[in-house]
Amino acid sequence: MASPVEASPGCASGLGPHRRKRTTFSVGQLLELERVFAARPYPDISTREHLAQITHLPEAKIQVWFQNRRAKRIKDRKPGALNARLELPPNCSLPDTPQLSWDPGTPSHPLHSTSSAQQTSACPPQTSCLAPILGPGQSWSGAKAAAPWGTSEVSGVHSLEQIVPQTSLGNLSDLIYTSAIVTNVDHS
């Protein structure tokens, strides 16, 4: 069976069925949407309206984006589902837990990292995870007290709980994803 676009040769002249234009989000819009999604995947109307003002998107599009993002998260967590974020080049591996030296003057930047596993040049830099490793049953609420960046306001964010949901991170993709969010918030 042909798709509606293929089945309607009159589509180019405006006679065929109308197809809704796909929304393209800018990098800034996506970063803001992902940041809020990490804190609250089910935002209330006031949060969505605030996002609409910040991103210059209609509230309805923001609501649909959150619905789609929740569906994607559920799909990614199904057993046996391939997760594109975890696909690494064959000659690349995640490093062991790095030992970091922190400069108290600049709490968000490590001075250096020593790890027993060195990355190869083909490894993308985002594969090294500098977030604390949490065991089963641990949550970010317990880890935030030991976080080197503290729990005071960072770039308008009031606490780590607003960046990262308080759930157990037994899934490696969640850990990598959360680390990227914390890193992005830290550098913004």
Curated annotation (Swiss-Prot):
Keywords for the protein's UniProt record, in alphabetical order: Developmental protein, Differentiation, DNA-binding, Homeobox, Nucleus, Transcription, Transcription regulation
Keyword match Transcription regulation: yes
One GO term (biological process): embryo development ending in birth or egg hatching
SMART domains linked: HOX
Signal peptide as annotated in the record: none
Start-end of Polar residues biased regions: 111-125
DNA-binding region: 18-77
GO molecular function, one term: DNA binding
Compartment list: Nucleus
Region named Disordered: 80-125
Database matches in InterPro entries: HD, Homeodomain-like_sf, SEBOX
GO cellular component terms, semicolon-separated: nucleus
Matching Pfam families: Homeodomain (PF00046)
Biological function: Probable transcription factor involved in the control of specification of mesoderm and endoderm.
Homology family: Belongs to the paired homeobox family.
Name this protein carries in UniProt: Homeobox protein SEBOX
Organism, scientific name: Rattus norvegicus
Organismal lineage: Eukaryota, Metazoa, Chordata, Craniata, Vertebrata
Gene: Sebox
